[in-house]
Amino acid sequence: MVSPGPVFGIVLLIIARVSRSAGIGFRFASYIDNYMVLQKEPSGAVIWGFGTPGATVTVTLCQGQETIMKKVTSVKEPSNTWMVVLDPMKPGGPFEVMAQQTLGTMNFTLRVHDVLFGDVWLCSGQSNMQMTVSQIFNASKELSDTAAYQSVRIFSVSLIQSEEELDDLTEVDLSWSKPTAGNLGHGNFTYMSAVCWLFGRYLYDTLQYPIGLVSSSWGGTYIEVWSSRRTLKACGVPNTRDERVGQPEIKPMRNECNSEESSCPFRVVPSVRVTGPTRHSVLWNAMIHPLQNMTLKGVVWYQGESNADYNRDLYTCMFPELIEDWRQTFHYGSQGQTDRFFPFGFVQLSSYMLKNSSDYGFPEIRWHQTADFGHVPNPKMPNTFMAVAIDLCDRDSPFGSIHPRDKQTVAYRLHLGARAVAYGEKNLTFQGPLPKKIELLASNGLLNLTYDQEIQVQMQDNKTFEISCCSDRHCKWLPAPVNTFSTQTLILDLNACLGTVVAVRYAWTTWPCEYKQCAVYHTSSMLPAPPFIAQISHRGI
């Protein structure tokens, strides 16, 4: 016969072990933490995490001693996850979020404090998005201004890659934080994106309520690594798994390095921009998909440099498809709380290296960033906005001319687009002028461009505008100097063409102009005209 003492001791030990094991797996998702910003009304914020299968989880939102709301759910198998959607909340705070897991008589409690409600924006892309405030112009002043923006909270995802879609982040680079000179200026390409921070700061200046900024970027990366397999399949992207970094690639070369020839030999060009992972979908899997349950206001994106010489012609499909896929994923992941067609902003590529060279494919990528429309929103890219950056060159950047340091102007132009597209602000100029009519005046040897806005011609040269001149089935691009201009029209001289003019293009080079000195701007906002290319009809278009 066994004495009661040892049996009772064994029972207590078993109960203790069960109790501990029941609480070990109970946690919030990786990005639910102190100081976070949750999406405000009209959407509901999603709170989720992991727990013990079969357990009940009660999520309570409190402010001081007041209980604002309670939501009850259970831990689902086989994912061992729980999730609730909070009722829509007005902007403000701070609040506390408490989650309590109950399994039989055992309770385990988690808390996060100083939680705000506002708008949450995800920022992603490659190195120009990854650059920190310490790397930009006037860094000291920008870092000294953080005290005024304690309601703009920041979060940064670690550099992680995965062959499969992850449900949660495996690492966090910077957990939700109030901005400081330390975490904004932590070093080069670490912690927090300068473009993201400045964009959020400009939004806060306008909206005057909390902004949450989530940075998930990796320098030197193709769009393919940020795209799901669904996106790549939809665009017929070859399923390459090449891990080479910085290896020479074969690409066509302009004959004698000029842009006038239509056929070119091939040469080997070192791909100096590719320093990140190259395996398709690995960053989508590890750095974007784990965020899918987060309720978002929108996304801003700065990427494309690496695709200037890699799958360039597929970019016009991949970028709109990426936007559509991200929208669908975040909508369903957030239980329908993130808008199905949430606003998506992006930066059109700036300049790189050699002046007046189109050898790096930048003009084509800029065009493909708009799905070959030249402007956004457009039928293939609804509810999008773009910051044109062709005039923000920086040949003296210590990080290379591909990394211009004026991120303030980039972010300001982005925030104008957000105010117009995401927030519906009326009568706000948020993009530069584009031709709405192109008329060939053949008898006078002139081409008349009528713009959709008032224009200011900042500079006249014989290189910015070009015409495609065809003779005997051979076409080449020739300069078309500005003849005259007025408030909304600009006339080009076609005398250089002795054949038939079939197309016109503007700013179609890697380096279109010097800093803020491109040819055409909007008169009052001084937003630059974006690059364009258009076929010419003899009856006008």
Curated annotation (Swiss-Prot):
Q: How is it modified after translation?
A: The two subunits are derived from a single precursor by proteolytic cleavage. The lysosomal isoform is glycosylated.
Q: Which residues are glycosylated?
A: N107, N138, N188, N293, N356, N427, N448, N462
Instruction: Say yes or no: keyword Endoplasmic reticulum present.
Output: no
> GO:BP terms for this protein?
carbohydrate metabolic process; regulation of immune system process
Q: What is its EC number?
A: 3.1.1.53
Q: Where is the signal peptide?
A: 1-23
Name a GO molecular-function annotation. sialate 9-O-acetylesterase activity
Q: What class of enzyme is it?
A: hydrolase
What does the UniProt keyword field contain?
Cytoplasm, Disulfide bond, Glycoprotein, Hydrolase, Lysosome, Serine esterase, Signal
Means of activity regulation = Inhibited by diisopropyl fluorophosphate and diethyl-P-nitrophenyl phosphate.
One cellular-component annotation, GO: lysosome
The cysteines joined by S-S bonds are none
Q: What does the subunit comment say?
A: Disulfide-linked heterodimer of a small subunit and a large subunit.
What is the role of this chain?
Answer: Catalyzes the removal of O-acetyl ester groups from position 9 of the free diacetylated sialate N-acetyl-9-O-acetylneuraminate (Neu5,9Ac2) in the cytosol and of the diacetylated sialate residues of sialylglycoconjugates in the lysosomes. Together with the sialate-O-acetyltransferase they regulate the balance of acetylated sialoglycoconjugates, key players in various processes such as cell-cell interactions, host-pathogen recognition, and tumor antigenicity.
Q: Which named protein is this? A: Sialate O-acetylesterase
Organism, scientific name: Mus musculus
Q: Which gene encodes it?
A: Siae
